[in-house]
C-alpha cells in the first residue's frame, strides 16, 4: 500500500519525522517496505496484512497515526446539492446475486463535463502509482485511495433501458473489460449488467462498453460490497487482478460505502460540474449492528504482563473508533464497522498492546505458562516405536481406506463385513480396513518388487471394527489403535520381539499363546496371544501371530514364508507400567540348576514355565529355555525333552543346597502330576 505524506497530512498533523513515523507504524503492525520521493512528496510503502483492509486507504493509515500520536483525525465534511428528478426516474437496480453482492448502491449525476483533472488531483494519484484517465474516473480512484472503498462510474446513456442487474454470468458470455481484453464469464461470476449484456465483472473491473468518455453527460456512480471469496475466485479464474479486487478480497467497511459514494458526488460536482439526482438506490440499507466485546483489565494484565489503567484502555480503544462504556469488571466495546477483525477480547488486548507499544512490555514480565505433559498413550507409543525400531523393523504408514479385495485377505478380529464410505477416498478404495496386516503385506510386496529384500515393517494406526447388528452403536465402527507387524520367516523371532515389547512396557503377568485358525493365516500356523495373571483379572486377548497363508504369499509374488502379527494398542497401554518400579538387588548368592524333562508333545512351554514360577515363587530369579530334543526310540512316540535353567535366589538369606532341592522336588512333583512329566537324572 503506497501512501503519500502530503495526502496523509490532510487528515492528521504529521508531528513525527519520517524515520520516527515508519518505526512506530512498523511496531504497530504496518511494516515499512520502503520510501521514495515523488515530485517533492514522500511516498511510503507499507505492508498491510490481510485482516487490515481498513488500512488500504489514506484515512485508515491516518487513523493509525492519530492513535499512535494521540491526535484527532480530520475527516472531510461532505456537502453537495441535489436537484432535478429523483434517481429512480433514471435508473432501476435489481440484485439477483446477494450471496456474492450483499449490498449495491447507485447514484446518478447529470450534466457532467468530462475532461482533464485539476493538477492537485493528478499529482495525488501519480504519487501513489495510479494512472490519470479523466476527471470522473480520477475522482473514483481518488476516493478509493482515500478511504479504501472501490467505486465505478458508468455512462448512463450506455446502460440499456436504464436498468442495472446484479446477476450470475451466463455460459459462453463474454465481456470486454476497460483493459480492452475479452474475458469468458460463467455462472460463478458476479456480473453487473444492463437489460441485455454484461457491463462489468463485479468487484474486479468495469467493461469498455459503458466506460466514461469525453462524450459522457450523465453517469451512474456504483458503490457496493462484494463477498471476498467470490471476488478472489473470479479474479484468479480470469487472471484479472485490480486495486478494486485487492480491496474487496480483504473486505470493505459496510458503513463506509455510502460515505464513499457521497464523497465522490461532492468531488465530481466540484471538478466536473453537474447535479446529483435526489436520493440513492440501495439494495440493503439495513446494516447489522456489531456485537459488544467485553474487555477486562485483569485479562489485559494476565496476557501482556503489565498493568494499564482503565482510563488508558478507554482512550486507546476510542482512538481506534470503538464505542466504549464502563461495566463492573471493565469496559464494554462496540468495534467500528471498518474493523472486521475485532470480535474477541483477545483482539482488543492486541490493539491495546499495539497502540500502547510492544516496547513498553517488560522483558522479564512473568507470563503464566500452563505446564504440559505427554499423554500416557503417547509415552507408550514412543516406547513401542523404540523397541520395534531397535529390533530392525521399519515403520510404515498406509491408507486407512482400502479396496474390499485387500481387506478380505486377512481379518482376524471380526467376521462382520467391513464398513464402506459413500464415495471413494482413493481410486477404487471405499472400505474402512478391519486389520493392518493386508496393508503391510501389500507394502512388503512393493518393497520386495523395488529390490528392498529386507522389508520387515510395523504400523501403528486405526482399524475400524463393525459393531454387531442391534447394538446401540451399530452405525459406527469400533475405531481403535492396533499395532501391525510383518517380517521374514522366523516365527519365534517375531514372538520374541512381542515379548520384549511387553517387558519394556512393564506389563505384569504372562504372555501366553493358544492355537487358532483364521482366514489368511496358514493352516495350523497361527496363535492367539493372551495376557494372563497379575493385573488382568481375566485373560486379555492381545492379538494374533502366525504365518501368512502361502496362497497370499504367492499372490503377492513374495519368496519364502512371511510371519505377521497384530496387537491391540489399547490392551498394551492399559496394562503397561510406564514408570519403572525399583527392585532391590539381592546381596545373597544365587543357585543355578538345569532340568531336563520328558513331556508329552502337546505341552507348551508357557504351561511348563507357569508351573516353575508357581513352585519357586519369589525365589525364582531367572528362568531360561535351552532346547527341545526328540528321540522316539528312547522316549516313545509323541514325547519330547525340554531342557531349561533355573536361577534361585532369596532377598533375605543365603539359600542352601537343601533349599534348592526342596524347590526342585516340589516342581518335579507338580510336573509329574499335571503334565505327565518325567525328570531325566
Swiss-Prot record:
It is an enzyme of class 6 (ligase). One of its GO terms (biological process) is phenylalanyl-tRNA aminoacylation. Residues 288-363 form the B5 domain. It catalyses: tRNA(Phe) + L-phenylalanine + ATP = L-phenylalanyl-tRNA(Phe) + AMP + diphosphate + H(+). InterPro entries: aa-tRNA-synth_II/BPL/LPL, B3/B4_tRNA-bd, DNA-bd_dom_put_sf, Fdx_antiC-bd, Fdx_antiC-bd_sf, Phe-tRNA-ligase_IIc_bsu, Phe-tRNA-ligase_IIc_bsu_bact, Phe-tRNA_synthase-like_B3/B4. It is found in: Cytoplasm. Mg(2+) binds at residues 341, 347, 350-351. This is Phenylalanine--tRNA ligase beta subunit. It comes from Rhodopirellula baltica (strain DSM 10527 / NCIMB 13988 / SH1).
